Amino acid sequence: GPMTGLFGDSELIEMRDDERLDTSRIEPYLRENLFKSDAPMSFAQFGGGRANLTYFVRCGDDEYVVRRPPLGPVAASSHDMKREHRVLSRLWRGFPLAPRSFLYSDDVSLIGAEFHVMERRHGFGIRPDLPNDLRGDTDTCRRIGEMVIDTLVALHSVDPHSVDLDSLGRPEGFAARQLNGWTKRWHAAKNTDLNDFD
């Protein structure tokens, strides 16, 4: 179908009023630390997303994504931009499908929170609302499922040492930590008592 949205891109919207970036602060920072260019810079917001706020930045012909935690209080470990940057600034070397993160900042005076800037990759998330041209075709759905599995196998085949990520994380006790963490998040966020969840 026809492209809609900002810059002819259906993923992009005008920045929401309450989620607007202060471009007057971040633009000089990006020019000094990443772009090294005085080409025109434009900003928009990605309309989708599930938690973190994601913004589009174009400088000349180059496209980037700025990611920051959501507004309001967040659990310290659930939106760790520094960790996300650390992983994505290295993982692409052993897993070329990963977008490369170029820049991390913990200077909250720039946009109100820590953030990182990564390359933009075009595509779509595998969710129940697949693009219309991929719905209902059993063969296409099977091929997508196989591609997802193959991609996960390739990701899990990356040797952490080879991409300088061997000191990341604590693999021992992962499942117990996840269960404990999600239980705490549930208790912090619930507004209805559902005994079956406890």
Where are these regions (language model features)?
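Juxta-kinase regulatory segment immediately upstream of eukaryotic protein kinase catalytic domains
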Residues: 4-37, 41
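ATP-binding pocket architecture of kinase catalytic cores
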Residues: 38-198
